Amino acid sequence: MGGSGDVEHRSDRSPTQRFFSTRVRGRVAVATAVLRIATGLVFVLFSLPKFLAHEYELAEFVRYGLPDSSAIVYLVGALELGAGLMLILGIGTRLAALGLALNMAGAVATAGVQVGGPFHLGVAPALLLSMVYLVWAGSGAAALDRALATRFAPSASRGSSGTS
């Protein structure tokens, strides 16, 4: 991989700046963006049956040991759709990834335990690890988070001293 310049370690930023910033640079930032966008697309696709094949998804949730509640299926679908779109756009990446990491932890703990198999014990844990990485790394390249990090930067760090 690249040198030590591929990972940023800065503590002189505000919590808001750190929330919207990315820890990675260069090729690692590009790879992180590819991971972010690809997993965002996966979650958007996973959300659709929760709305379009709701009764089937509800029966699956019951099979996984969850309560017989349409609200749970709709909430999970809304989380996957909303957070998946956030990942694709690269906005609020850490927050979206945290919500989806909790979702995947729940999927492994329910469907993984009740059903098992390569999907629930392979894909779901891989998505969980991907989300944990995005919580740590941030959005990578080509993300709206980067523009927001710049917007929230103190004026001195943006090169504006306030005088002409």
Residues of each region from the PLM?
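Extended, low-polarity transmembrane helix blocks
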Residues: 1-52, 71-78, 82, 89-164
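Short juxtamembrane and helix-loop transition motifs at transmembrane-helix boundaries
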Residues: 54-65, 82-90
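Structural signature of hydrophobic alpha-helical transmembrane segments
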Residues: 61-75
